[in-house]
Design a protein with these regions (language model features):
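N-terminal low-complexity, intrinsically disordered segments
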Residues: 302-381
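Extreme N-terminal leader/targeting regions
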Residues: 267-331
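C-terminal functional extensions of proteins
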Residues: 100-102, 110, 118-125, 458-522
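Internal active-site segments that recognize and position negatively charged phosphoryl groups
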Residues: 112, 374-417, 424-428, 435-445
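Extended, intrinsically disordered, low-complexity segments
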Residues: 215-279
Length: 522
């Protein structure tokens, strides 16, 4: 549905040959969709890593990626995402500098690009196809980069490496909300980086990504760098902006600049919508309000200059940023586990919140006392249960303590899972300083030596940044033999439902979605 919606917008405006659409699903899924519905996809996305083990976390291998590169058809080829630090933070650094790992990713991307071009030549399609690499610098957090200077250094290093590899490399100059980089610092970073001429920058309606909870470049930043550094939009898109009426013949913004309602009106007219302009604009206003109510920012208009946000939106974004800082450092109150029916308090090896933030591995393993507590529960229950519920603070303890949304979500999950015939344990493991992998450790302890399909359903406080205090559900199903192997269960077999809060995706719908996903896992 998302692929189709994006394709429809580009086709309707007649720019599908100038700009590709892409959905950040696993490359296997994109290839399957293209096989079922040829022409539905454009660029194929995949995150890649610098070692076989780290790539395994993304459920890819070099051989698999080579096959996808050779099978990809059309003008638009492959879109890779990389970033320094992804390998060692997933436990696959092997004592090697993260800069070396990043360069290996670029080597892999170059090889895959070559395989794509050769396959196209053999089929008589010509050798040219779009291949992009997006360096998501700073995405992981302070365990990789602490401040703005380190972020700039990383971006410059990666631009040089990418260009030396002959890649079209662009940047997602991003920073998490638990790094010591502010909204305003991000503007400084952009000015330091742009003279190195990256191939492109990401863009959002503001500098906050509401889905992933991090900061990156906004659309208004693109206006700024055109003004300051003289960069240009490519000719096809600039002509389209003129045709759309947001840029005049002299290249200056018109009264429709920064107005998504005007774009929606133009879209409807191209769809032969016969309603009056006012009716369509009123509908656009309603739809924008609906999107904003879900925590997604849509910028309208601009500030005193066309390269700045409208003042009210800028103030709103700064308030969200400040609230996110509170969420990141907050901790679960004493006795919180007692407020969750069946709650059993356990904890990880993090010494304190600072240790947890700066050393994520400490929040991925349980402390000895917690393991002993789980082992006693295992003896008590034997093999009566096949599904365990886990609740962790993650990077947003306040998502757990805001109203009763965590309790409601747990209760809804229990109800949905039992309705599906799951044998759900009565306890809920409430983990302090718990990251997603801490849930896997619970499964390894409780399911050790068992047979059959066994599940962990783990509710985690999402890292903040949307303006909503949201929870995610991580759903992991594996056989007993897999759970019995240390660290065998990982993100590559886990599904997630995100953005759950009373003010976003409500707990009941979140629980129903998780149950439906689990049914599809076997």
């Amino acid at each position: 549905l998302v692929e189709a919606a994006l394709k429809d917008v580009l086709d309707t405006f007649g720019i599908s040959s100038a700009i590709p659409h892409c959905v950040l699903a696993h490359i296997d899924i994109q290839a399957q969709l293209e096989g079922v519905k040829p022409g539905s996809t454009a660029l194929w996305f995949q995150s890649i890593a610098g070692s076989d083990a780290a790539n395994g976390t993304f459920d890819v291998t070099v051989d698999k990626m080579m096959r996808h590169a050779q099978d990809k058809r059309g003008k638009f080829g492959l879109y890779f995402e990389t970033g320094q630090g992804a390998d060692f933070t997933n436990g696959h650094g092997f004592g090697t500098d993260m800069l070396v790992h990043e360069s290996r990713k670029y080597g892999l991307a170059r090889s895959l690009s070559g395989a794509l071009m050769q396959a196209r030549q053999r089929r008589g399609e010509g050798s040219d196809a779009w291949v992009h690499l997006n360096d998501v610098a700073g995405f992981i957090g302070p365990e990789v980069f602490r401040n703005r200077e380190q972020l700039v250094r990383c971006c410059l290093e990666d631009i040089v490496m990418g260009k030396l590899h002959g890649l079209m490399i662009g940047l997602d100059v991003c920073t998490t909300l638990h790094m010591d980089v502010s909204l305003d610092d991000l503007g400084w970073c952009i000015d330091q980086i742009m003279p190195a001429n990256p191939g492109y920058l990401m863009a959002l309606p503001t500098r906050i990504d509401p889905m992933l909870g991090y900061l990156t470049t906004g659309y208004h930043d693109h206006v700024h760098i055109r003004e300051k550094f003289g960069y240009r939009v490519n000719d096809a898109m600039w002509d389209f902006f003129r045709e759309l009426g947001v840029i005049d013949q002299q290249g200056q913004p018109t009264e429709h600049f920064g107005d998504p309602s005007w774009v929606y009106l133009a879209y409807c007219r191209r769809k032969s919508d016969t309603r009056s302009d006012q009716e369509i604009l009123d509908e656009a206003k309603e739809r924008i309000a609906q999107v904003r109510d879900r925590g997604v920012f849509i910028s309208q208009g601009h500030g005193q200059s066309v390269s700045s946000l409208a003042e009210d939106l800028d103030e709103h974004i700064h308030r969200i940023y400040e609230d996110a800082k509170k969420c990141i450092w907050a901790q679960l109150p004493e006795g919180f586990e007692d407020t969750i029916p069946g709650g059993v308090g356990i904890k990880t090896q993090s010494n304190d919140r600072n240790d947890y933030i700066l050393h994520p591995v400490s929040g991925e393993s349980l402390d000895p006392e917690s393991i002993r507590r789980l082992e006693k529960l295992k003896v008590l229950h034997g093999e009566k249960h096949d599904t365990l519920l886990v609740l962790s603070d993650g990077l947003n303890a306040l998502a757990n303590t805001t109203g009763d949304q965590a309790r409601e979500l747990i209760e809804q999950l229990r109800s949905e899972l039992i309705s599906d015939g799951r044998r759900v344990a009565p306890e809920v493991m409430v983990i302090r300083s718990g990251r997603v992998r801490a849930g896997y450790r619970v499964g390894e302890t409780m399911f050790q030596g068992r047979e059959g399909r066994l599940q962990i359903v783990h509710v985690v406080g999402e890292r903040p940044g949307s303006g909503h205090r949201t929870l995610s559900i991580y759903i992991t199903s594996a056989d007993g033999g897999t759970w019995s192997q240390a660290s065998k269960v990982d993100h590559n077999i886990t599904k997630v439902v995100s953005g759950i809060a009373h003010t976003a995706l409500v707990p009941k719908l979140g629980a129903q979605t998780a149950a439906r996903i689990l049914r599809g896992l076997g």
